[in-house]
Design a protein with these regions (language model features):
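Short acidic/polar active-site loop segments enriched in Thr and Asp
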Residues: 49, 98
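Activity-critical C-terminal alpha-helical subdomain
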Residues: 146-147, 151
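Conserved acyl-donor/pantetheine-binding loop and adjacent beta-alpha core of acyl/acetyltransferases
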Residues: 1-26, 31, 42, 57-85, ...
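C-terminal "cap" of GNAT-fold acetyltransferases
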Residues: 83-90, 95, 106-142
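A conserved short alpha-helix in the GNAT/GCN5 acetyltransferase fold that borders
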Residues: 36-45
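Active-site cradle of extracellular carbohydrate-active enzymes
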Residues: 50-56
Length: 152
């Protein structure tokens, strides 16, 4: 698959342990926290283990200015004090999206990212207990996760 159009042309699987397309870009941190608190028990109940999302890399253009022979992948993997040097990747890492799956040229129009994007993967906390969550009603999963949501 090469385009978003290609992706929507294939049939969706009946069940999947993965979900794509949650956005945490917001001006309100409280809004992001509310989305995660609401979504988490639903993800556990549905058996989702991983969440994938796409992100721009807004520091890329400035970083490449002084490094004519550098590769985009080098920027995406670059760390300072163990954290990604790109501010967006650093933010997503703090929210649990620690795996960089792919670097995608022409991902979407974003000037500071030179239209590059990265595909990131995060693991749904406590998803290894999938058989337990599947056996419980959603209300019980919500009751269990509510006091733990501050850890997200």
């Amino acid at each position: 698959m090469r385009t978003w159009k290609d992706c929507v042309q294939i049939p969706a699987p009946r069940r999947s342990a993965s979900l794509f397309g949650i956005s945490l870009s917001s001006r309100s941190q409280a809004g992001v926290d509310a989305i995660l608190r609401f979504f988490w028990p639903h993800a556990l109940k549905r058996g989702w283990r991983h969440i994938y999302l796409g992100s721009p890399v807004p520091g890329l253009r400035d970083w490449l200015r002084g490094r004519r022979q550098a590769h985009v992948e080098a920027y995406v993997q670059a760390r300072r004090a163990g954290l990604p040097i790109d501010p967006q990747l650093r933010y997503y890492r703090s929210r649990g999206f620690t795996k960089i799956v792919a670097v995608k040229p022409g991902y979407f129009p974003h000037e500071r990212s030179l239209d590059y994007g990265v595909l990131l993967r995060g693991t749904v906390p406590l998803s290894t207990l999938a058989p337990l969550w599947a056996a419980l009603p959603l209300a019980s999963v919500q009751r269990v996760t509510r006091p733990l949501a501050a850890l997200l």
